[in-house]
Amino acid sequence: MRINPTTSGPGVSTLDEKTLGRIAQIIGPVLDVAFPPGKMPNIYNALVVKGRDTVGQQINVTCEVQQLLGNNRVRAVAMSATDGLTRGMEVIDTGAPLSVPVGGATLGRIFNVLGEPVDNLGPVDTRTKSPIHRSAPAFIQLDTKLSIFETGIKVVDLLAPYRRGGKIGLFGGAGVGKTVLIMELINNIAKAHGGVSVFGGVGERTREGNDLYMEMKESGVINEQNLAESKVALVYGQMNEPPGARMRVGLTALTMAEYFRDVNEQDVLLFIDNIFRFVQAGSEVSALLGRMPSAVGYQPTLSTEMGSLQERITSTKEGSITSIQAVYVPADDLTDPAPATTFAHLDATTVLSRGLAAKGIYPAVDPLDSTSTMLQPRIVGEEHYETAQRVKQTSQRYKELQDIIAILGLDELSEEDRLTVARARKIERFLSQPFFVAEVFTGSPGKYVGLAETIRGFKLILSGELDSLPEQAFYLVGNIDEATAKAINLEVESKSKK
């Protein structure tokens, strides 16, 4: 077992015995601190600034050492606002990296980057803590079995299946439905797999964090009456936090997930919304630390920072962490260094398309751009692979024909192409699905569709058995039987109108 959580007991020294330094310089969220000769803190040590500001308000700021500058000075990044700090203030070296509470006590609670509860539900049992910086598991501890992680979402399970213990990227610009998809996945996984989730809200909107919390309480993922029965722990470092907090909140969430995997030997889901904000926070801090910017103004250490986070997210012989990461794509440009670096670590990508969202097809997952290393006949089986390939071919042909249709109209197409277009439009609509978490907006009850049902449905559309049904019947339904029932209802309605 890799993890060695520290158990704080009577033997742990108090802050009073620690080395004291003084603030020498403050540049926004970055502090330079002078220490006595020979008493320098280590890289990643947590420093605490306590005192009162000019108005007499209590100050308690935790920082993390990033650089040793020479001349007995260190440069540290603050994890909370530096308002009210002045030069000459006392700084305490805690002698250890940031450590956060782990284990069952974290379920149903909301934490900040320091592992402090921020949900006004009282203190958390902090007897078991783990440092947020740790090396990735050794090769010999990794589990190499390949298996599919069923999500109950048709377009995902069929065309870009997720790997159990893999890393999945949700790509998309602003407002195409990433967060709703993440909420649906948390909901489905808690209900269908009974798994524990850790949600890391990295640099996103506070309102969304609050909505997600309320949604989880309503759906029973968080059990207010008995928090121990909750299925998720939440860690937030939102947009209003300084870059230091946004840069480290992902590691706090990951540390909590690692404990469930290594000590409790569970399968864990780690959601990160949004991994781009992790990179962005690193880039904000990087220039203040005096590093030369790299491509497009990003930090030169971009690949290293990303690697140190991603390599810890993996399956071991004890358990697995399956990670689903929302990736904001700046200006919808997939070649931007932030999404491009993220791509290198992923087993599957779910790309959300603005075009599909504009058509009202939700989830707006692009069937041609989304990929998965799991979509191979030896892993998913011949039937699944064949069906997925035929769905992609039909969608691709429809895409190629769209220019001709726009200029000349459908009548100019050959009989075969017209049939392809009709089936592709049915497929496009059948890839949409009502979500449990969107019931409030849509009014239609959510649907969980098993993989076997999904394959059966698409095989029927491709075989031509359902060519006579109107394409509207396939829109926002669960399995194929619902589509045929909807077609009958539509027919009855149209007759009654006449």
Curated annotation (Swiss-Prot):
<dbReference type="InterPro" id="IPR050053">
    <property type="entry name" value="ATPase_alpha/beta_chains"/>
</dbReference>
<keyword id="KW-0150">Chloroplast</keyword>
<dbReference type="InterPro" id="IPR004100">
    <property type="entry name" value="ATPase_F1/V1/A1_a/bsu_N"/>
</dbReference>
<dbReference type="GO" id="GO:0016887">
    <property type="term" value="F:ATP hydrolysis activity"/>
</dbReference>
<keyword id="KW-0472">Membrane</keyword>
<dbReference type="InterPro" id="IPR020003">
    <property type="entry name" value="ATPase_a/bsu_AS"/>
</dbReference>
<dbReference type="GO" id="GO:0042776">
    <property type="term" value="P:proton motive force-driven mitochondrial ATP synthesis"/>
</dbReference>
<dbReference type="Pfam" id="PF22919">
    <property type="entry name" value="ATP-synt_VA_C"/>
</dbReference>
<keyword id="KW-0406">Ion transport</keyword>
<dbReference type="GO" id="GO:0045259">
    <property type="term" value="C:proton-transporting ATP synthase complex"/>
</dbReference>
<dbReference type="InterPro" id="IPR024034">
    <property type="entry name" value="ATPase_F1/V1_b/a_C"/>
</dbReference>
<dbReference type="GO" id="GO:0005524">
    <property type="term" value="F:ATP binding"/>
</dbReference>
<feature type="binding site">
    <location>
        <begin position="172"/>
        <end position="179"/>
    </location>
    <ligand>
        <name>ATP</name>
    </ligand>
</feature>
<dbReference type="GO" id="GO:0009535">
    <property type="term" value="C:chloroplast thylakoid membrane"/>
</dbReference>
<comment type="similarity">
    <text>Belongs to the ATPase alpha/beta chains family.</text>
</comment>
<keyword id="KW-0813">Transport</keyword>
<keyword id="KW-0793">Thylakoid</keyword>
<dbReference type="InterPro" id="IPR003593">
    <property type="entry name" value="AAA+_ATPase"/>
</dbReference>
<dbReference type="GO" id="GO:0046933">
    <property type="term" value="F:proton-transporting ATP synthase activity, rotational mechanism"/>
</dbReference>
<comment type="function">
    <text>Produces ATP from ADP in the presence of a proton gradient across the membrane. The catalytic sites are hosted primarily by the beta subunits.</text>
</comment>
<dbReference type="InterPro" id="IPR000194">
    <property type="entry name" value="ATPase_F1/V1/A1_a/bsu_nucl-bd"/>
</dbReference>
<keyword id="KW-0934">Plastid</keyword>
<dbReference type="Pfam" id="PF02874">
    <property type="entry name" value="ATP-synt_ab_N"/>
</dbReference>
<dbReference type="GO" id="GO:0005739">
    <property type="term" value="C:mitochondrion"/>
</dbReference>
<keyword id="KW-0067">ATP-binding</keyword>
<keyword id="KW-0066">ATP synthesis</keyword>
<dbReference type="InterPro" id="IPR027417">
    <property type="entry name" value="P-loop_NTPase"/>
</dbReference>
<keyword id="KW-0139">CF(1)</keyword>
<protein>
    <recommendedName>
        <fullName>ATP synthase subunit beta, chloroplastic</fullName>
        <ecNumber>7.1.2.2</ecNumber>
    </recommendedName>
</protein>
<dbReference type="InterPro" id="IPR055190">
    <property type="entry name" value="ATP-synt_VA_C"/>
</dbReference>
<keyword id="KW-1278">Translocase</keyword>
<comment type="subunit">
    <text>F-type ATPases have 2 components, CF(1) - the catalytic core - and CF(0) - the membrane proton channel. CF(1) has five subunits: alpha(3), beta(3), gamma(1), delta(1), epsilon(1). CF(0) has four main subunits: a(1), b(1), b'(1) and c(9-12).</text>
</comment>
<dbReference type="InterPro" id="IPR036121">
    <property type="entry name" value="ATPase_F1/V1/A1_a/bsu_N_sf"/>
</dbReference>
<dbReference type="InterPro" id="IPR005722">
    <property type="entry name" value="ATP_synth_F1_bsu"/>
</dbReference>
<dbReference type="Pfam" id="PF00006">
    <property type="entry name" value="ATP-synt_ab"/>
</dbReference>
<keyword id="KW-0547">Nucleotide-binding</keyword>
<keyword id="KW-0375">Hydrogen ion transport</keyword>
